[in-house]
A protein has these predicted regions:
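Active-site cleft segment of glycoside hydrolase catalytic domains centered on the general acid/base Glu
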Residues: 63-64, 68-75, 99-203, 207, ...
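Glycoside hydrolase catalytic-domain groove-lining segments
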Residues: 34-37, 177-181, 196-269, 275-278, ...
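Active-site beta-loop-alpha junctions enriched in small/polar residues
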Residues: 13-16, 53-55, 93-97, 145-150, ...
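Conserved, mostly hydrophobic/aromatic
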Residues: 11, 40, 91, 143, ...
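Solvent-exposed, low-complexity, repeat-rich "mucin-like" stalks and linkers
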Residues: 381-411
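Acidic (Asp/Glu)-rich catalytic clusters
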Residues: 3-5, 35-44, 76-87, 131-138, ...
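Aromatic-rich peripheral "rim/lid" segments of glycoside hydrolase catalytic domains that contact
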Residues: 233, 252-268, 273-284, 289, ...
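N-terminal substrate-binding region of glycoside hydrolase catalytic domains
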Residues: 1-76, 80-82, 95-121, 213, ...
């Protein structure tokens, strides 16, 4: 309920160019090789999100990996999305590599800048980048100023300084096109008081933005009822639009490329079966949670549904060569000069190949059609998804008493 043609049904496929360069191929539902952008559009996707790093290369031009997502990659992805009738969200990290709550490093070129110099640089970089993107005919509907900026941004941790940088980016967007929505992106809706504090700080510091975007991964971020509650507070108290900028779910326990996956893992709560149906149900429910906010709820982006293996899991050494050459793993060894504590230690392949909406061979899963089915509905044959494990304790030489019932979950 509450889903319309205007609802954002988005995906972030920022890694796609590096994957294709690595030899990964994609197919349609008839197992015929086809441009993935066409397949996505045919499956109901209407928006593509793409991350942009300032300079994800070392001094010798070696890419840090994670898709090597510089502006040129964004232009290529944006043009292909636009050609297939999908709007584009540009996700500026304002970093040379991954930005998230644990790390918000300034780009190498900006690391010794004062806050005033950072404001100017961020404004100019945003404006010049958008001018290049738009000159290529890319249909930009939204720009994200930062990525998961929970109290840190471009190396700054004081809200007064963070807010100045947000406004520098927002100003650039407004000057380019007042119709482009300005989004800010945060995470951890499950932490008590987190979003209340962030939205309060944004208001107190007069930050100019349109959309409060949240990450929501079911195995990390609490209940959907809480997500709706948190987003509804922001919509009602501050008059902002809201959305989920990242979500995903596992469809298999298998690892496709020999590099470990982020889920399932110890300490995670998996409320849906690990299956294609479980994945589809998870995504459907995230859409409903955002729609339950009301008119302010814009929609949902699925994160990296096509970050597939570049080779099989039993061919790890060859996979490593490909990841290093094309940047198609989550990080390359070259990233250690910029991010020695994380990428420098744990570089490698895809950590989400088992959360794709395509199988390891590039064929779309039925769960990809969820972007259509949330509009039309769909009926599947009734089938058992999972059976709850039951433990029985018995004593030697005594009658074994089995439970009268067990819990079965259907699709």
């Amino acid at each position: 309920e509450g889903i319309s043609d205007d609802t954002i049904k988005g995906v972030d496929i920022s890694s796609i160019v590096s994957l294709e360069d690595s030899g990964v191929k994609f197919y349609d539902f008839n197992n015929k090789e086809q441009d993935i952008f066409k397949t996505l559009s045919q499956s109901g996707v209407n928006y593509v999100r793409v991350r942009v790093w300032n300079n994800p290369y070392d001094k010798d031009g070696n890419g840090y990996g994670g898709g090597n997502n510089d502006l040129d990659k964004a232009i290529e992805i944006g043009k292909r999305a636009t050609a297939n009738n999908m709007k584009v969200l540009i996700d500026f990290h304002y970093s040379d590599f991954w930005a998230d709550p644990a790390k918000q490093k300034a780009p190498k070129e900006w690391q010794n800048y004062t806050i005033g110099e950072k404001e100017i640089a961020l404004y100019q970089y945003t404006k010049e980048s958008l001018e290049k993107l738009i000159s290529e005919g890319i249909d930009i509907g939204m720009v994200q100023i930062g990525n998961e900026t929970n109290g840190k941004f471009v190396g700054e941790s004081e809200w007064s300084k963070i807010s100045k940088l947000f406004n520098a980016g927002s100003k650039a967007v407004r000057e380019i096109d007042s119709n482009i929505l300005v989004a800010l992106h945060f995470t951890n809706p499950e932490k008590i008081g987190n979003y209340e504090n962030i939205s309060y700080q944004l208001s107190e510091n007069n930050v100019d933005y349109d959309v409060f975007a949240s990450s929501y991964y079911p195995f990390w971020h609490g209940t959907l009822d809480n997500l709706t509650t948190q987003l509804k507070k922001i919509a009602n108290n501050y008059g902002k639009k809201v959305m989920v900028a990242e979500t995903s779910y596992v469809y298999t326990n298998e690892d496709g490329d020999g590099h470990g996956n982020t889920s399932p893992a110890n300490g995670q709560t998996l409320d849906y079966p690990i299956s294609v149906q479980g994945q589809a149900t998870s995504v459907r429910n995230v859409f409903q949670a955002v729609a339950n906010v009301g008119e302010a709820g814009l929609g949902v982006f699925y994160w990296e549904p096509a970050w597939l293996p570049v080779g099989t899991s039993d061919n790890l050494e060859n996979n490593k060569v490909i990841w290093e050459k094309y940047g198609s793993g989550w990080a390359s060894s070259f990233a250690s000069e910029y991010d020695s504590e994380d990428a420098g230690k744990w570089y490698g392949g895809s950590a989400v190949d088992n959360q794709g909406l395509f199988d390891f061979n590039g064929k779309p899963l039925e769960s990809l059609n969820i972007f259509k089915y949330i509009m039309t509905g769909a009926t599947a044959p009734k089938a058992v998804e999972s059976i709850e494990n039951v433990e029985v304790t018995v004593n030697s030489y005594k009658e074994i008493k089995l439970p009268k019932t067990v819990t079965v979950k259907y699709n």
